[in-house]
C-alpha cells in the first residue's frame, strides 16, 4: 500500500516491497546464529533495531521507489533476529522460571501481531501511512535504548 499510495508504484510492482523485506528477513534469520555468536545478543538487539528504524526512515523520507525498497531490506535485516534474541534472553534469565518468561514474551508478541496492524491503520487513517511508519521507527529506537537491559 505504501509503495502504491506514496511512491507511485503500480500494484503489480508493489509486491517487490514485501518480497525484498521477506528475503532480507529470511537471509538474516538464516545467518542469525553466526551473528549472535560474533556480536552477542545485546549488540544484535541494538544494531538490529537501529537498522530497522533507519530502514523505515529511508523508506519514508527518501521519495523514490528504489529507496523504499532499500529501506524495506534494512527493516528485514534489522528485525530478523530481534525475536530470537529476546526468546533466548527470556529462557536464560533467572528472575522467573524460563517457561513463564517465554510465555510472557509469546503473549506480548501475539498481542503485537493482533494490535499492531490495527494501530498502524488507525494512525495512517488519522494522519498518513508515513507517520505511522515513523511511529514504528520510534518504537524500534526504544528497543535500541533498552537493549542493554533486555539482554545481559
Kindly give the residue locations of the regions a language model identified.
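Paired small-residue
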Residues: 55, 66-74
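A membrane-interface helix-boundary motif in multi-pass transporters
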Residues: 121-140
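Intracellular juxtamembrane helix-capping segments at the cytosolic ends
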Residues: 80-94
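Short hydrophobic/small-residue motifs within alpha-helical transmembrane segments
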Residues: 22-23, 27, 110-112
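Small-residue hotspots at the loop-to-helix junctions and early N-terminal turns
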Residues: 11-19, 99, 103
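Short amphipathic helix-loop junctions that connect adjacent transmembrane helices
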Residues: 1-13
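Structural signature of the two symmetry-related core transmembrane helices
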Residues: 43-58
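Helix-to-loop junctions at the C-terminal end of transmembrane segments
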Residues: 28-40, 124
